[in-house]
């Protein structure tokens, strides 16, 4: 008779722990882990099918199945990135790190030189580090320095370094096509929108931070934020660079978190036909009005590109132009990607009214603090944030059927 192996409860628990799947990373050492994947088929506008509901963010473009395991997400992520660049914002240039050099001009001014084909673009960033040895987490503020429009005390009291991203040194928010700083390096990229160029600039800024000696920075824990058009900027940058651990998109509206399809049903809000085309490819106009249903992707998938890293979206329904009902639908849909991988609490959204544009109300401070504490400081705190009481009457089944 064969002997029976008996495991004590502690030994069995240890064995099960050892066999369990590793926790999904909160950031990566590479800008784009999906860069090696082949570009999927990208049909012309006339060849695209009509889809009234939001596309399934997990479904592979070739119809071969769904990305049900986290290990499959990298491939699906590559497809969504390709679609967003091809149909909306244009190609984000792939610039080798060897083209980037960094130096501190003084205690707080970081100078970043990006040289391509003998031409140089320079970014001047303000870097403020807490006193002490560190290493300190980092938050990049798009456009307006520090932590963007977020409350400074939340970051100052937690010893978090702040880095500014002066977007105008890469591309103006009004863009003259072919005559922007980035075109010194890439004169052929006249069709790209700012939401391709600005994330490129953020990535070069991160390259520079990686080069600094004795920086006292913890570059495994980088956050990015911005509000309004800079909230869109932060979202696009966080979606496109996987070295960013936490993306905080404050009131990003249409072109940011809001799903284009839903926005088209909401009246006088930012839609494909009513947006700033300095930010997008001119050809995106083809998807205006009823043609929005031909888009092979939508912005719940832009949000989902941040997965498995952390994303927090703040909305402000008092400003109709932001199309926050569309933002809510998009966030609910995107969060299902994190949920599929057992990490739904890495994606949060909070829609609060009765406050000024880009002024985070006191009620939302604890939600922000929780995400900062967990994903920048590594604390074990709950981050289950799904607040949108004014949109509870939304018929989600109209948009989400997967």
Question: What kind of region is each of these model predictions?
Answer:
Residues 141-213, 253-262:
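Cap/lid segment of the alpha/beta-hydrolase catalytic domain
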Residues 135-139, 157-162, 219-221, 242-246, ...:
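Loop/turn elements at helix/coil->beta-strand transitions in domains of secreted/extracellular proteins
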Residues 16-18:
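C-terminal motif of bacterial Sec signal peptides marking the signal peptidase cleavage site
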Residues 205-268:
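Primarily recognizes the serine-hydrolase "nucleophile elbow" in alpha/beta-hydrolase
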Residues 25-124, 129-134, 307-311, 316-402:
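Alpha/beta-hydrolase-fold serine-hydrolase catalytic core, especially in secreted/extracellular enzymes
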Residues 1-9:
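Bacterial N-terminal signal peptides that target proteins for export
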């Amino acid at each position: 008779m064969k002997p029976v192996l008996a495991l004590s409860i502690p030994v069995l628990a240890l064995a099960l722990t050892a066999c369990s799947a590793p926790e999904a990373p909160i950031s990566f050492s590479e800008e784009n882990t999906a860069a090696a994947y082949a570009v999927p088929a990208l049909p012309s506008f006339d060849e695209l099918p009509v889809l009234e509901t939001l596309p399934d963010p997990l479904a592979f473009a070739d119809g071969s199945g769904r990305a049900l395991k986290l290990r499959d997400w990298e491939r699906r992520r590559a497809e969504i990135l390709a679609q967003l660049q091809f149909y909306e914002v244009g190609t984000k240039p792939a610039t080798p790190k060897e083209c980037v050099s960094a130096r501190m001009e003084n205690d707080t001014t970081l100078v970043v030189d990006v040289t391509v084909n003998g031409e140089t673009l320079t970014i001047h960033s303000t870097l403020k580090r807490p006193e002490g040895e560190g290493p300190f987490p980092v938050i990049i503020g798009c456009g307006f320095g520090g932590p963007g429009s977020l409350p400074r005390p939340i970051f100052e009291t937690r010893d978090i370094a702040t880095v500014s991203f002066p977007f105008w040194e890469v591309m103006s928010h009004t863009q003259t096509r072919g005559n922007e700083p980035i075109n010194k390096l890439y004169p052929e990229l006249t069709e790209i929108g700012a939401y391709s160029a600005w994330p490129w600039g953020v990535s070069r800024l991160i390259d520079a931070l990686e080069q600094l000696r004795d920086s006292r920075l913890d570059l495994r824990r980088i956050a990015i934020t911005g509000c309004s058009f800079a909230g869109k900027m932060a979202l696009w940058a966080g979606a496109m660079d996987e070295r960013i651990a936490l993306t905080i998109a404050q009131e990003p509206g249409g072109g940011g978190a809001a799903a284009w399809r839903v926005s088209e049903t909401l009246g006088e809000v930012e839609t494909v036909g009513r947006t700033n085309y300095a930010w997008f490819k001119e050809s995106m106009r083809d998807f205006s009005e009823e043609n929005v249903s031909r888009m092979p992707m939508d912005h719940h998938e832009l949000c989902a590109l941040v997965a498995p890293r952390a994303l927090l979206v703040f909305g402000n329904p008092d400003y109709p132009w932001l199309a926050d009902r569309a933002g809510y639908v998009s966030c609910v849909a995107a969060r299902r990607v994190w949920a599929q991988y057992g990490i739904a609490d890495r994606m949060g959204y909070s829609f609060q009214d009765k406050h000024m544009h880009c002024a985070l109300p006191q009620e939302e401070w604890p939600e922000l603090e929780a995400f900062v504490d967990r994903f920048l400081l590594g604390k074990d705190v709950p981050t289950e944030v799904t607040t949108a009481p004014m949109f509870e009457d939304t018929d989600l089944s109209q948009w989400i059927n997967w």
